[in-house]
A protein has these predicted regions:
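Functional transmembrane core segments of multi-pass inner-membrane proteins
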Residues: 7, 98, 103-106, 110-205, ...
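Select subsegments of transmembrane alpha-helices in polytopic membrane proteins
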Residues: 72-77, 123
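Interfacial loop-to-transmembrane junctions
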Residues: 177-178, 211-236
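Hydrophobic alpha-helical transmembrane segments
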Residues: 1-13, 85, 89, 134-141, ...
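Alpha-helical membrane-inserting segments
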Residues: 18, 22, 84, 88, ...
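C-terminal ends of transmembrane helices
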Residues: 19-24, 60-68, 108-118, 162-173, ...
Length: 258
């Protein structure tokens, strides 16, 4: 029980840092200074008003000084990070893979939210993440360096092909190159099978959300939501359950074989 509490606190603390990253990185601000302040009145936030989730609840989602509303994104990111860490712990306990996967999950959360709010996927996250994933593959038993490289090339290459084909047909970008670099990271950490699983699931979920928005709006409604917003949660789902789902799917064909 003590370990679970520590992991929850660890996840909430990392989530608080991710909130800083999500807000500041797209604005090219330093991640460490100046200290956090209210976006409405610029009053510096005291440490006791910056406790993950708890401060938001005690302040009822408002700044102590100007009563300006605090976005729900802050507690949401903190809770998502804590839950992600708990899910990873439930599968891998306190292993090296657990800590590495926590970093991968943090990268996905940051990329997903930044893409949702700013429609960019910063290289400052994807490229260092790719490098760490490749280095980590040297110490893994489930995925070696060769497989990590194949995963990166396969995932990003397929998306790059779609990018080029769409541009040739429509004369405009259907995907951003940031999605391609994000798939380099995803493929390097998960391998080619789970990279394709991520792409298929993200496309399916994105299509469902798109259909929902189209039905809720007028017929000429132009639906647009960054693909990285879907890649992030589906890549995490692939990390947790991807291999089991793929194996279960393939076993169906084996059972159908006469």
């Amino acid at each position: 029980m003590e370990t679970i509490i520590i992991i929850i606190c660890f996840g909430l603390a990392w989530g608080s840092f991710l909130n800083v990253l999500i807000y500041r990185l797209p604005l090219r601000m330093s991640l460490f200074k100046p200290s956090s302040s209210c976006p409405h009145c610029n009053e510096k936030i005291k440490f006791y008003d910056n406790i993950p989730v708890l401060s938001f609840l005690l302040l009822r989602g408002k700044c102590r000084h100007c009563k300006g509303r605090i976005t729900l994104r802050y507690p949401l990111v903190e809770l998502l990070t804590a839950v992600s860490f708990l899910l990873l712990y439930s599968q891998h306990s306190l292993s090296f893979f657990f800590f590495a996967s926590c970093l991968f999950a943090c990268a996905l959360i940051a990329l997903g939210f930044i893409d949702f709010y700013h429609q960019i996927l910063p290289d400052e996250i994807t490229l260092p993440g790719l490098l760490l994933a490749l280095i980590y593959s040297l110490f893994r038993t489930d995925l070696n360096l060769r497989q990590a490289l194949i995963g990166a090339v396969a995932g990003a290459g397929f998306l790059l092909f779609i990018y080029g084909a769409y541009y040739l047909l429509r004369k405009k970008e259907g995907l951003g190159l940031g999605d391609v670099t994000m798939m380099l990271l995803v493929g390097a950490y998960l391998g080619w099978r789970q990279a394709f699983f991520t792409l298929i699931l993200a496309s399916f979920v994105g299509a469902l959300v798109g259909i929902f928005f189209i039905f809720c709006k007028k017929k000429d409604f132009q639906y647009s939501l960054p693909f990285g917003t879907f890649l992030a949660p589906t890549a995490f789902a692939a990390l947790l359950w991807g291999e089991r789902i793929i194996n279960a799917y393939l076993s169906l064909f084996k059972n159908l074989t006469p």
